[in-house]
Amino acid sequence: MARTVFCTRLQKEADGLDFQLYPGELGKRIFDNICKEAWAQWQTKQTMLINEKKLNMMDPEHRKLLEQEMVNFLFEGKEVHIEGYTPPAK
C-alpha cells in the first residue's frame, strides 16, 4: 500500500515519496509534506533552471540558489521564473 501525505504544494492527499530524496532537515520536510506529483513538477522546473541559468552543481552558490528556488516552489507556492519561458495555456 502506498504511503499518502497531505501535499503542501498541491493542497491535497496524494501518494508520498517512497524514500527521502534530499539530505538533512529539508529532505525530511520534503519527505513528510510533498507528494510524488509535486516532486515531479519540481524536477521539471529544476532541469529548466539548471539549463537556462547555466548552473554548475559543483558551485556551492549555484546549489544554494537552486535549494532556495526549491523551497519557494514546494512550500511557499511561488512559481519558478525562467526568463523567456511562457507556460502553455490551460
Swiss-Prot record:
Keywords for this protein: Iron
Protein name: Probable Fe(2+)-trafficking protein
PANTHER family per record: FE(2+)-TRAFFICKING PROTEIN-RELATED
InterPro entries assigned to the protein according to its UniProt record, in alphabetical order: Fe_traffick_prot_YggX, Fe_traffick_prot_YggX_sf
Entry's family note: Belongs to the Fe(2+)-trafficking protein family.
Its biological purpose: Could be a mediator in iron transactions between iron acquisition and iron-requiring processes, such as synthesis and/or repair of Fe-S clusters in biosynthetic enzymes.
GO molecular function (one): iron ion binding
NCBIfam families per UniProt: PRK05408.1 (NF003817)
Any single biological process term in GO: cellular response to oxidative stress
Record-level GO cellular component terms: cytosol
Originating organism: Vibrio cholerae serotype O1 (strain ATCC 39315 / El Tor Inaba N16961)
